[in-house]
């Protein structure tokens, strides 16, 4: 059983009176800058299971990637690119500050996509106070289903209740209306369009920067979102 670390007061309040173990699973250690890897066990719900990414997920991700791209605004691998994509994700994980998952449809056991924690931020070298959910893509058959919102809830629960962060970022290319609608549907709050915020991930836009639509969830909003 993983240790929980010290929970923030707001995280204790959010979980009080309600058994959240079924949602957030066994607790991983709270990340700390002295050991900043965003390690996390599998997260399971009724709709989707998020398994820490391994090379064993490559065949399933290849099938999930069939017909998934090219995406107009995001980096989605083709089936032939999946093996290298997984290798890069695992290299980022091993370097710290990145925790990739394979998304598994609970009803069928099929791999239907990829998602991750990234961009951790530390309070004056101390506790983790913010993290991002991103690097998300889904097989065409899983888009528009309950998989994406269910996965987001699992990740939000672990970050807000388990790690006790003060903020979770979710962002997308400002031009991606479908992704913006999907993020808003999770209950995340739209904050702003950040101009020229980061390099574009859109095909054919290497070397260009994009405007980014920024959303977030904070502890006071979590009871409504969950």
Positions of PLM-derived features:
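Conserved acetyl-CoA-binding loop-helix of GNAT-fold acetyltransferases
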Residues: 144-158, 181
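GNAT-family acyltransferases
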Residues: 23-145, 158-162, 197-198, 203-226
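Conserved GNAT acetyl-CoA-binding A-motif
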Residues: 161-171
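Conserved active-site alpha-helix within GNAT-family acetyltransferase domains
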Residues: 176-192
């Amino acid at each position: 059983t993983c240790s929980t670390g010290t929970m923030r007061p707001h995280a204790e309040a959010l979980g009080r009176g309600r058994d959240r173990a079924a949602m957030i699973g066994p607790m991983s250690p709270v990340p700390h800058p002295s050991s900043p890897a965003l390690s996390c066990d599998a997260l399971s719900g009724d709709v989707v299971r998020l398994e820490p990414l391994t090379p064993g997920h490559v065949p399933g991700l290849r099938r999930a990637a069939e017909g998934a791209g090219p995406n107009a605004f995001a980096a989605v691998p083709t089936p032939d690119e999946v093996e290298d994509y997984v290798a890069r994700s695992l290299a980022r994980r091993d370097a710290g500050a990145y925790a990739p998952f394979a998304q598994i449809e609970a009803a069928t056991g099929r791999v239907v996509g990829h998602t991750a924690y990234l961009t951790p931020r530390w309070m004056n070298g101390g506790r983790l106070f913010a993290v991002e959910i991103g690097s998300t893509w889904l097989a065409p058959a899983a888009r528009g289903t309950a998989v994406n919102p269910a996965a987001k809830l699992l990740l939000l629960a672990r970050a807000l209740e388990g790690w006790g962060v003060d903020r979770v970022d979710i962002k997308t290319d400002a031009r991606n209306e479908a992704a913006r609608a999907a993020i808003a549907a999770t209950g995340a709050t739209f904050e702003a369009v950040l101009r020229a915020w980061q390099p574009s991930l859109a095909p054919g836009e290497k070397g260009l920067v994009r405007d980014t639509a920024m959303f977030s969830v904070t502890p006071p909003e979590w009871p409504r979102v969950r």
